């Protein structure tokens, strides 16, 4: 289950969101948290911090951009964010950085950079959402289970997941629309 943005932190709907997340977790759902925290909510950081921590604790995967972490923690560097802010709550961390390599950190000291395909993007709107979609596609395609996640993913599993995530994100940037093409979707469907 993918959740994120300010909606996942908003105190007004927090009881409903927290209840839904707890229900999903209790029933074995894999929880992927895209922090997606924007500067427009910067003045609310102190108010939402307890909800943020609770989301981090419930998540199996935490993804955010270096911009998110620059706003939230005043540190955009993946290692600093993971070690100081994330790893205590969630062991699987993904930090996207636009055209720069995606940084992954996980249990047992796993740390790897995944270079982005060099291209001239038509638009980057939707790149993060499509990265998330590609990651979830990878979980399904690779048959990654709750047991795999609890045990800790292998480097090969991470590599495959990041290939899928980056393929979706790159495809999205090739056009003015904020989603992958129908043709790309048809090709990906054949991989399932």
Locate predicted features:
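N-terminal glycine-rich phosphate/adenylate-binding segment common to multiple enzyme folds
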Residues: 1-8
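Conserved residues at the C-terminal ends of beta-strands
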Residues: 4, 65, 96
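Conserved beta-alpha-beta core of the PfkB/ribokinase-like small-molecule kinase fold
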Residues: 8-80, 100-101
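Conserved phosphate-binding/catalytic region of the ribokinase-like
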Residues: 22-23, 76-192
């Amino acid at each position: 289950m993918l959740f994120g943005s300010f909606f996942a932190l908003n105190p007004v709907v927090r009881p409903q969101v927290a209840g839904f997340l707890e229900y999903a977790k209790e029933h074995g759902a894999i929880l992927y948290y895209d922090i997606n925290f924007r500067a427009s909510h910067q003045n609310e950081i102190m108010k939402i911090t307890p909800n943020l921590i609770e989301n981090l604790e419930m998540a199996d995967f935490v993804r955010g951009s270096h911009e998110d972490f620059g706003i939230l923690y005043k540190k955009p560097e993946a290692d600093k964010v993971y070690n100081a802010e994330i790893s205590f709550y969630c062991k699987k961390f993904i930090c996207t950085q636009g055209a720069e390599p995606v940084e992954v950190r996980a249990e047992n000291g796993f740390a790897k950079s995944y270079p982005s395909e060099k291209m001239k993007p038509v638009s980057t709107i939707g790149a993060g959402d499509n990265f998330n979609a590609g990651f979830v596609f990878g979980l399904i395609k690779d048959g990654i289970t709750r047991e795999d996640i609890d045990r800790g993913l292998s480097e090969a599993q991470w590599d495959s997941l990041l290939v899928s995530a980056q393929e979706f994100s790159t495809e999205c940037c090739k056009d003015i629309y904020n989603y992958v093409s129908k043709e790309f979707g048809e090709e990906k469907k054949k991989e399932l």
